[in-house]
Amino acid sequence: MKKLIFVSTGRCGTKRIAQILRKYLPEEFAVVHQMPFSRLANVIGNLLFYLGPSDRVKRLLYKFIISSYCREKYFICSDPLTAMLIPKDFIDSADVCLVHIERSPEAFADSFFKLSRRRINSFIAHNFIPYWQIGIWPLENCISGRIKEKYVQVAKLKNKLFAEMYSASPNYVRIEMTEIFNSDFLSNLIFKFFNYEVIIPSNELKIKAN
């Protein structure tokens, strides 16, 4: 089963990517954005950053999370909450493509902060769930006057980690968020990796998911 996995810090257009691909690809493609247990995966992935990596934990949890989607021929995931948990056998596999999406750290920080103020679930996660984000401690989101600066550092750190962890993949791609939504990148990626031709109208790339 071929798998296309987008990894990112979040706030990188991954929800919109899933919406587009779900709309224009046939049913043999399982396209997911946020999966059950991915919030738990986010916390565990961040906790492993401090405790040290465990590929066994990553493999067991990640394969459990995606198991219900593996009935289709192809699997596409854009869930940023599972981005820290990709196991080594996925990284090394020629049947897995890892697309590392980057966004300007400053734009990420601004978007992330606004989301934490706009949605109650996001506010609760960012302020009351330990290890929800690397380097950010409970309540820091709402009491620190330098929180945006810290989110800038989070973005830089996570993108560095993703490059270190996943660049060994035979199908690793690193790309800016803006390029995805201003080019034929998605169509070309689907054709190159899955050998499936899909036409995505340019106007679809201009619509924001949230």
Which positions does each model-derived feature cover?
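A general structural motif
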Residues: 1, 71-73, 93-96
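PAPS-dependent sulfotransferase catalytic core
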Residues: 1-64, 69
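A structural signal for short, well-ordered beta-strand segments and their strand-loop junctions
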Residues: 6-8, 30-33, 75-78, 97-102, ...
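Generic structural signal for helix capping and beta-alpha/helix-loop junctions
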Residues: 38-39, 108, 208
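A conditional alpha-helix N-cap/helix-loop micro-motif detector
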Residues: 55-58, 78-79, 155-156
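Glycine-rich phosphate-binding loop used to anchor ATP phosphates in small-molecule kinases
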Residues: 64-88
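PAPS-dependent sulfotransferase catalytic domain
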Residues: 81-199
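C-terminal accessory extensions appended to soluble enzyme cores
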Residues: 198-210
